């Protein structure tokens, strides 16, 4: 009988947290559990790490009892760091959507490295980890001085399970201001402003370490099973495609819609349009453009149920109903825009859903043009389940759009790092592009309006 190899993946997004159990033999999903995340008040808005730990332990314990678990892989959202002293936190883990005090913001802007060094744009709130750390260092000097390790979020959870502290490039390269992607080393912010001794030795996202006996007691797992160092979630989506020979673009969706292109010359890197270089699991810079698509959709369709029909989309095109960028200000390819509707107002739920679908497709097309358009577009995450969106995107770009058939590209990529295995990703056939009268003119008008909003 073949040896069992069940991999549990802790997939911690900004909005939701999941633990997925995958069969390492064929990467099929065995089980999964999901829960919403919460942000707590206090010194500043911070993540509920205690609740996240309980959720992780409960899921792992349940999976061990029902199916057996042979290894744990970790992937989380970026722009988050934990300050660790001993086996606890020196300070709560700051929520990156917290709007930093203006005085801190202005002071940090004079200290951060230039874009051509970090390929990291200045982003609002705490989306640059460097800004978070500067805030904590200057506002809470006593607590900050106790810090032994600064850990990016995947590595914090690996630390909780293995007791070992590491730095890792995919999370450091996620618009932190802390990393030089082209050089593969820390930026001058580390050492000049932030003590270098607080950043532990580098490890690869695929490096594995044994589960401690303490963590084994908490999770019900066997001590010593392998746990990965952890990877930034968008980069986990790239892992199955890293050895693909064809130029392609990955659209990873969730709270953020993130476009990354492999083997494609990018457009000019424009810090003013939320472009950056992510770092893939092999340590290579990856041109990236993104916007807060999941958050946009949530705000635009609040109270709506279902999905848009093609007839509803055709009606929106015919009536000239437009959603402008900037519902979430300060991010995306139009960071100065302030959102709103243009043209005729939507009538009812159906037109809201249809307008939102067109908006997401047009914003994704814009990001693809910035990051570099591949010969194929692969959809991962919630947008992969939105057929009208996929068909509109194919029509707008003129490029074949495929929906990933994997249960979750993020979880699959994280599992592959532990398995040290290649994988032929499962794709369905290319979607059929929509053929809607007026779509091209509608898109042209939307782009003109969006440029005016810049």
What are these model-derived regions, one by one?
Residues 68, 195-198, 373:
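Short loop/turn motifs at secondary-structure junctions
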Residues 8-9, 109-123, 128-166, 177-192, ...:
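Active-site core segments that coordinate phosphate-bearing ligands/cofactors
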Residues 1-93, 103, 146, 217, ...:
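N-terminal glycine/serine-rich phosphate-binding loop of ATP-dependent small-molecule kinases
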Residues 99-113:
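Hinge/lid segment of periplasmic solute-binding proteins
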Residues 34-40, 94-102, 173, 255-257, ...:
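Short, acidic/turn-prone active-site loops that include or flank metal/cofactor-
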Residues 192-207:
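A conserved helix-loop-beta module that forms one wall/lid of the active-site cleft
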Residues 61-97, 121-127, 154, 158-180, ...:
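Short beta-strand-loop/turn "lid" adjacent to the catalytic site in phosphate-handling enzymes
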């Amino acid at each position: 009988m073949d040896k069992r190899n069940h991999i549990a993946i802790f997939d911690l997004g900004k909005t939701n947290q999941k633990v997925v159990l995958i069969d390492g033999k064929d990467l099929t999903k065995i089980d999964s559990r999901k829960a919403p995340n919460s942000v707590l008040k206090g010194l500043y808005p911070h993540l509920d790490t205690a609740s996240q730990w309980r959720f992780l332990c409960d899921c792992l314990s349940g999976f061990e009892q029902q199916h057996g678990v042979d290894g744990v892989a970790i992937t989380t959202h970026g722009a988050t760091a934990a300050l660790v002293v001993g086996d606890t936190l020196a300070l709560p883990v700051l929520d990156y959507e917290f709007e930093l005090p203006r005085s801190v913001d202005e002071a940090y802007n004079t200290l951060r490295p230039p874009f051509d060094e970090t390929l990291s744009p200045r982003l609002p709130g705490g989306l640059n980890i460097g800004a978070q750390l500067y805030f904590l260092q200057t506002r809470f000097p006593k607590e900050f001085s106790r810090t032994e390790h600064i850990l990016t979020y995947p590595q914090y959870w690996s630390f909780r399970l293995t007791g070992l502290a590491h730095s890792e490039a995919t999370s450091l390269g996620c618009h932190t201001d802390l990393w030089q992607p082209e050089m593969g080393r820390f930026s001058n912010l580390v050492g000049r402003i932030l003590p270098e001794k607080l950043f532990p030795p580098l490890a690869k996202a695929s490096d594995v370490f044994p589960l401690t006996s303490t963590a084994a007691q908490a999770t019900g797992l066997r001590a010593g099973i392998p746990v990965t160092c952890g990877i930034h979630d968008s980069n986990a989506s790239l892992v199955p495609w890293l050895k693909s020979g064809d130029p392609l673009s990955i659209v990873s969706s969730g709270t953020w819609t993130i476009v990354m292109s492999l083997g494609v010359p990018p457009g000019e890197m424009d810090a003013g349009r939320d472009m950056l270089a992510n770092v893939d699991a092999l340590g290579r810079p990856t041109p990236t453009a993104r916007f807060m698509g999941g958050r946009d959709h949530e705000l635009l369709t609040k109270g709506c149920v279902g999905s848009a029909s093609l007839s509803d989309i055709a009606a929106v095109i015919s009536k000239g109903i437009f959603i402008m960028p900037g519902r979430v200000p300060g991010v995306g390819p139009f960071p100065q825009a302030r959102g709103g509707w243009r043209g005729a107002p939507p009538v009812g739920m159906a037109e809201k859903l249809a307008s939102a679908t067109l908006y997401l497709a047009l914003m994704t097309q814009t990001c693809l043009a910035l990051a570099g358009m591949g010969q194929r577009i692969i959809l991962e995450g919630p947008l992969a389940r939105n057929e009208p969106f996929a068909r509109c995107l194919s029509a707008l770009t003129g490029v074949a759009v495929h929906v990933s058939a994997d249960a979750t590209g993020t979880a699959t990529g994280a599992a592959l790092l532990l398995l040290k295995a290649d994988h032929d990703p499962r794709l369905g056939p290319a979607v059929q592009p929509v053929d809607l009268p007026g779509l091209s003119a509608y898109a042209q008008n939307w782009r003109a309006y969006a440029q005016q909003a810049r």
